Amino acid sequence: MVCVPCILLPVLLALYIKFIQPIVFRFLPESWRTTFDALLYPTCPIQIPTASAEDATTVAAGKSVKVDGENVQKELDNYDNCTDSSKKNK
């Protein structure tokens, strides 16, 4: 048999993350949201290598670019589904 907290806590946590957390985050200031996101979902920031203007045109055309011995294919930044509104302003 499984104890009640082993079933109840994951269900409550899933409900909080899915429904309650987005509502709470709407009322928090932007600086608090970014701080909480960094604490709750720790990830390393993505570092996109810079390319010259000539390479940028081939990237925009959808071709791969050779950067530091690796084939890198970049896409245009699409922040429509991003929860961090500071990225939308860039």
Curated annotation (Swiss-Prot):
Belongs to the UPF0729 family. The lineage of its organism: Eukaryota, Metazoa, Ecdysozoa, Nematoda, Chromadorea. It comes from the Eukaryota. This is UPF0729 protein Bm1_03610.
